Amino acid sequence: MLAAGLVFTRTARSQDSAVHYIDYPGTVGKVQSLPWDGVPKWATLDVQLRGRLEGQSSDNFISGNGRAYLLTRNYVGLQVRPTKFLTGYIQSIDTHALGLPLTYVAANMRDTFDDRQAYLDFHMKNMHVIAGRQELKYGGERLVGISDWTNNSRTWDGFLGRIGDKNRLDVFSTSVVAVHPTSLDTHGAGLTFHGAVGTIGTWVPHMAIQPFVYIKSFPRVQSQQGIFGTETITTPGVEAAGNIPGGFDFDGLIAFQRGNYSNDSVVAYAGYIKAGYTSQAAFLKPRLLGEYDYASGNTRKDLTKINTFDQQYPSNHNAFGLTDLFGFQNIKQERINLDLTPAKRVTVLLQQEWLQVASRFDNIYSGSAGTVVKAPTTGLLSDDIGREFDASAKWAINDYVVMNVGVGHFSPGAAMRENGHGAPLTLGYMSLTYRFKVGHKGTASAP
């Protein structure tokens, strides 16, 4: 939501995406460096502190069921560099939802002092092999990302191999980590998420291209006919983003899915396109962006076939509005964004979304792929999910402390109102984030 464009990372490590897109609401501001000779030259400590006050008017679409609570998150990490070819990193997480009854605490809100990351990075020139608990995030993070906005951001256990820098190839075999609020976080049995992601950063001027293929597999699922079996879904696709002379920018993704879900076959697809224009010379440096999103839904024309797109492991915050009510499954969206820069350290975003289901015979899904509204056998009477208006702002108070504020208002459409989800919802938030690192004076930076 800052100035339009893309930023290529300079160092290859497991936390890095090949390309960071400005529309993902990541953390802005710098990491404060605090030199201390008491820390060995081969080690660096890093800390991130974040608190976010949230309030909403009608939790679970129940009128009058308002909630206000404080989400706190602390990361503490330690990087060690015992040799020229080996780096180790471990990071703890401690998150809480203060003021919220446990019955309302979601799985992504609370994790009492746990291990978030722990990996070894064997590296030589532009080659890396990373083993352990690590982050995965690619492109706009619409299919694979850490979901940093949530209190418990996502990590994976497994292996990642990387060769190259601005033009590179990543290959990984992992299993997503399941958060257990009061015990150690674990992953499922076996490695269940695999992928290969290429990054083409210099072949086409002013453009980054990421072809990818992801494979999601589970040993036991139940089909639409109630038959148990294995799941294997392959998701090939490509994402591209770039700047066009004259102040224009774009970002687009297309993905297809084929595979099996027990005895059912999977045939699904999804994509989005964004196109924007920024006037650097005008007052407030306005940037106008148009966006269209589509993810297929089950048509029920063939009861042995599943057409619902599997959203994989996305960063869904603000993908379909600030209220984060819906996911990238059985959905269509038209959106208009207006970014403004009233001051050097302040950005403002205004946006309007219109949401519909792709198929009236499939459910309406949440950001975590759960069911918000279950479609009756005869299908939903309307495809209108609703519309939302959002206003948000970021203020870098200084180089190291960043404030985020925002409010989103969702107005349910006929598909929601006719199925017991008719209460409008307003959500507001205010957050502060501070990051710093401690290391021996003159030594290498931490992650």
Could you say what each language-model-derived stretch is?
Residues 190-193, 313-341:
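Outer-membrane beta-barrel signature, preferentially recognizing the C-terminal barrel domain
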Residues 52-56, 85, 95-97, 136-138, ...:
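Structural signature of outer-membrane beta-barrel domains
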Residues 16-20, 125-129, 147-302, 336, ...:
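Signature for the C-terminal beta-barrel architecture of outer-membrane proteins
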Residues 27-31, 57-62, 101-103, 141-144, ...:
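Extracytoplasmic loops and strand-loop junctions of Gram-negative outer membrane beta-barrel proteins
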Residues 3-66, 77, 81-83, 284-292, ...:
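N-terminal periplasmic/intermembrane-space "pro-region" immediately following the signal or transit peptide
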Residues 13, 396-423, 436-442:
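C-terminal beta-signal and adjacent terminal beta-strands/loops
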